[in-house]
Structures are given as C-alpha cells and as structure tokens.
Amino acid sequence: MQGFLRSLFFGVKKIPKPFAPLVEKGVLKEALELKKDRYFLKEGFDIGKVEKVKDKAFFISLAKNYPKDPLIKNLPPSFKTDALILCQIECSKKRPIAFFKAALLNADHTMIAYLAKKNNQIVAIPFKEPFKKPVSLKHSQKSLLELPRHCVVKIDTKKREISEILGALEDPLIDENLSLSLFDRVKDFSKDCLNLAQHYAQLKASDFKDRINYSHIPFITIDPKDAKDFDDAIFYDQEKRVLFVAVADVSEFVPKHSSLDKEARVRGFSVYFPNSVYPMLPLSLSQGACSLKAFEKRLALVYEIPLDNLKNARLSQGVIEVRANCTYEEINHFLSANQSSLDKDLQQSLLGFLEMALKLKKERLKKGFNFNSFENKLYLNKEGRIEKIETEKESDAHTLIEEAMLLANQSSARLLDEHFHNKGIYRTHKEPSLEQQKRLYDKLFDYEIVRPKNMGFFPFLEHALKIAKEKSIEREVSRLIIKSQNLALYSPLQESHFGLGFASYTHFTSPIRRYSDLALHRLLKELLFYQAKGCSYLLEETPELCAELNALQKKAALIERDFIKRKFARLALELLEKEFLGVVLEVKDWVVVGLKEFIGLKVLVKTNKVFKPLEKVRVTITHADLILGQVRGEITERIKEHVS
C-alpha cells in the first residue's frame, strides 16, 4: 500500500482495483485531483506516518521534506507510531502543523517492548512509547518469569503474544539488533537473494566482454582502517594531468527487478556500527566480487578526468586491478614523512594529485562551505561497551579522496544535465531559510560571535568559523552551523547543492552501500553503452525512487543515532554519582552539557538557574536511561571563564 500512496505524489495514470474504494467514495476523494490524465495528491495535502515522542505526535511524510517534522493536531489517541494517515499541512515559521484528516492504515501489528514488573504482574512496555499503558500478555506469569530481567521482545499486538526474543536490555550485545528492530530494518537476506548473489560472485571479470582493460594502471583505494567494502579507487597521471576514478560496477551483479535488486532497494543504504556493518547487498558481493580488492581483477566504471578541462571527462566500462588497499592513516604518514612501502608510481600519483586536490579545494571553498564535522568514532570491546572515543579530523588523505570523488560525482551530474535536460537522480541541498539563518545568528550571538552589518549568510559562516578557531570553540560552532542546515536530499530534478557550492551534483561513487549510486549507474550505462533504449523507463521511476531514498536515508541515520545514544547511556551507568568537567552546549527545556573527558556524551540537566552556552561547569551523572538513550545529571559547580 505504501508504494501506491507514495506514487500519488508523482501522479498515477490508473487507480489499482484494490485501492479504488479509497478514491471513489473513501478518504482520499477530497485529497486527489486529475491533471493531464494522472491522479495527483492536491497541494496542501500529505500522506505519511505517525512518530510519537512522549506526549507529542509528529508527521513523517512519505515523499515531502520539511525543515522540521510537522506536529500533528487532533490525532485520535488510538493511533500508534508508524500508522499511515492523510493530513492537511499548514506551514508556519517555527514548525509546520499537520491537521489529521483520515486514517489510511493503522500501525503494523508488531511492537518492540521490554518486560517489567508493574503491580506484581510482568507486562510489556513499548520502547517507543514507554509512558503509555503497558501491554498485558497472554503468556502465563510463570513462563514470563523464566525470561531474563527486562527482556526485550517483539510482540504481536493483535494476539498479545511474543513473536521474537531479542535478549536482555542490560546486555550491551543486544544493541545492534535492538536499534535495527526499532526502525524495522530488514536484517537478513532471503535464500533466493543469497543464492543469486553467490551465483554472480563466482563470475570472473574475463566473463564480461567489450570492456576497456585498465589493469595496467596502478589504482589505489584509501579508506578507514576498519573498511571491508572498497567502492572506489584513484590514480593520477601527472604527465597527462588526467585523474582516473574507478568505481565498482555493481549493476553488472545486480540485475534490475531481481531479488537482489528488490532487497537492495528495500534497504536503500548499508547501516554502519562501530564493529559491524549491515550491508545493502549480501557479503559475497559487498565484501567479495564487487569490492575493489588489491590484486584482484574487478569490473569498474572508470572516469578519465582531464584536470585542465573538466567538461571533457570520459566514462568507460572497464576492468581494473587495484595495486594497494590503504588506510587514511597510512597515506597521511606517507604524505607527512615522505616514507612508504608503496611503489614509486603510486607515490608520485598521490603527491601529484595532492597538489591538485588542495588547489581544487581552495577554489571550491570560494563558493562552497567546509563543514568541519569533528566525527566521533567509538571503539567497542568484546562485551559491546565503549572502550575509547576518538575524534576524527579531516586530513590531506581525506582531501585526496574527497576531491576525486567530488569530480566524479560532478561529471556524472553534468551527463544528466546535458542528456536528460536536468532530470535524473540528483543530490541537492537547499540554503537555510531566512528563519533558519536568524535562529543561527541568535545562537552564535550567545557564543559572542556577532554578524557584521550587511554581511551575507555564506561569508558570515566563514567569518564565524574563523572567530571560533581563534576562541578554540571550533567544534561547538561547527556543530551549531551543521544543525542549522537543511538535510541534503535526492531529487529527480536538478537543483543546486548549497553546502558544496555546486549548481549540479549527484552520487556516483558508492554503489556498494547506496542504492542511489547503483540506480544512477544503470541510467548512465543505458545512455552511454546501450543506445539509450531504456532511459525513459528508468527516468520515469526516479521521482518515486528519490522519495524512497530520502525516507531510507533518514531511517539509516536514526538507526545509527539510536545505537550511539544507547552506548553512551550504558557508559553513563558505569559513571553514576561521578563528577566531570563539562561545557554547556545548549540551553532549552534542559541545559545540555558536553563532557570534556568523554567527547560525545551529553548530560541533560533540569535547573531553574540561568546558564549560557560555553559556560564551564562541573556535572555529576545521576541517571542513565537505556530506553530513551538519555543521560541526566546535576550541575555541582559553575566555573566563570569560558572553556578553552
């Protein structure tokens, strides 16, 4: 049903029989209009899911994107999280309002809950709505007592029976499965899918004809040290000033409409945890036949990009053999110490392209923005607890890969612009609205960063980061700036990418872990190598596909965030009643304090006292909630000077 409802945003020629009653006499009648022989959802109407947070209900659209999820008004209390509803949307400055119009599909009859004793009875408490009335189960109290304390279970809400046992809440090794289950991420591949993947994984590069042989070119991959799937490789020919970017040709192993394709599309993206990955494709492909492993012949789509004339980039179907799989750390060591066991031609390639990459980046940042995200990387021990936290900062090795990938992605967007009249699968990013900009100015004012009169938004961002660097508060200011931005989205129509400063952009370089890139590969291959016969068909599905991908992208981010929050809550349980030095990050209903010793751990403090962002404080951890992934505490001392 979701597929049909999503298609109404983009127009359907015919209403399928099972859904005709909804349209002819039912709840959708007033919300649809006929335009150019297609049924469309009228302007102002929207279809989406219910997401409950404490006593509030928010609306998550199936296809549209809002700066903030709309708050639902007049929702009947019987509606649970994930119910599908029709709403009328009223946009306001702060947060859009969704007025409930009709029910389309109540929530799935399954729920993740944990068992707890209430009034001497073991009951199930919903994870997503722990403040609601507990669910009494049909199982005997004796059988429930045999399960671990705070056992996490999946429940069939119609039958009020346990359908799956996930494990004990207190066990840190449950966290991956729990986060995936909470957001309905499909974990396992079907038998058909695995068999098909195994079949394709056994094919050799030599089995594929009409490909250019690039195996003499010494490509190199550069990835994080824990990477297992290698999507992309580069080589720079200094003499010809040509950059080669090779990207795994995944579409050769994933036929359109096959079980492999359908299950990849349902996932949309690979989900990454600190110690594992839940891939979009089976491991025999994602870490096997498609992965660009050193000294293995692999199928690839290869861009040859002349740096003196970027518009003359050429895309070919090739066979490559990567010379080395390297980590960012290894390449950074080589670039700083000029010592490496890499072959001389690889060393020359890296040094030559670094010089060009730094120039490209400098030029790009005249129009684009350098978002310093200060990503926190968690390292977990065998028990699933946080062992250490490292902050990863951008390096020259990152710049090498980033600039190469940006060039390949831009080259792909240029092909869409020229051949499909600005239609396809684009990656877009809207500039923050005036209201969003004003909120950021106000927050930065609290950080004693003032916007000079008549300074535009983009120059001010650079100005703010420059001051932040001088004040040694770059991390905090970067976090605020990133939070003020709109989400980058997939779009079937060309729009600019504000953050990067590009008029046109797409995703091409990660087809092992992103379905968007796989779909783009099919479109470009059809255009360049197969007489463009199937292009119109592939283009027709891009509006619906982009809407799906935007929803799946959000889901993947929520899964990863939920996991991290719970890991920090577990860490906090070991630190109860201990005092730490912290800095005030935010002041809203709660004062949010970031700990200096455990970067990324945020403590919520309820207080009547007035605090300012960047105040240095001492905070005691008093409570950690594994359900909500929250850590709470008390401020025991305020220190006058700002954090340095």
Swiss-Prot record:
Residues 573-644 form the S1 motif domain. One of its GO terms (cellular component) is cytosol. One of its GO terms (biological process) is mRNA catabolic process. 3'-5' exoribonuclease that releases 5'-nucleoside monophosphates and is involved in maturation of structured RNAs. It is found in: Cytoplasm. Residues 211-529 form the RNB domain. SMART domains: RNB. Belongs to the RNR ribonuclease family. RNase R subfamily. It comes from the Bacteria. Disruption phenotype: No visible phenotype. Pfam families: OB_RNR_1st (PF22896), OB_RNR_2nd (PF24190), RNB (PF00773). This is Ribonuclease R.
